[in-house]
């Protein structure tokens, strides 16, 4: 899950080893719009730009139209239920599916049991207000820390997996 203040430093730590494994990316509407306005012209010399522009991007939205997907290469609109789409995509042979840039999308997939890992970036900032990743009433979900890395700017990149018990 990518959050505020995402710098090249954080992207490098977060995605350094993952990019080679990811075959598909799932994005929410807002995240796709933001990223579609930046990454296509970011310069292919940036490692993440080359990756995100080339990878198939599946967009979860009730308001975007299939024609909107022309704004960014390799983008397609998820038709129908996103959970069914992700289940079907997971059933196909291939690498990792990454859900990026969409808190409500990540929340939905996690609570549906469709995420095998959850990566959170903790920034050394006290915001005092803003959206919460997990709303009141979210059921308890037990996770196990799989890895943690600190960036040179003090961000913590924490990756959790499903706990076996």
Set out the residue ranges of the language-model regions:
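Periplasmic plug
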Residues: 117
């Amino acid at each position: 899950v990518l959050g505020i203040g995402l710098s090249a430093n954080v992207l490098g730590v977060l995605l350094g080893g993952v990019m080679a494994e990811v075959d598909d990316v799932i994005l929410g509407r807002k995240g796709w719009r933001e990223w579609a306005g930046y990454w296509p012209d970011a310069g292919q010399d940036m490692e993440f730009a080359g990756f995100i522009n080339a990878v198939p991007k599946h967009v979860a939205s009730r308001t975007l139209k299939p024609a909107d997907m022309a704004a960014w290469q390799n983008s397609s609109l998820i038709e129908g239920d996103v959970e069914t789409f992700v289940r079907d995509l997971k059933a196909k042979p291939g690498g990792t599916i990454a859900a990026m840039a969409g808190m409500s999308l990540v929340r939905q997939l996690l609570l549906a049991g469709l995420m095998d890992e959850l990566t959170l970036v903790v920034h050394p900032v006290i915001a005092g207000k803003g959206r919460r990743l997990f709303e009141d009433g979210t059921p308890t979900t037990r996770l196990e820390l799989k890895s943690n890395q600190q960036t040179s700017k003090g961000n913590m990149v924490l990756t959790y997996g499903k706990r076996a018990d």
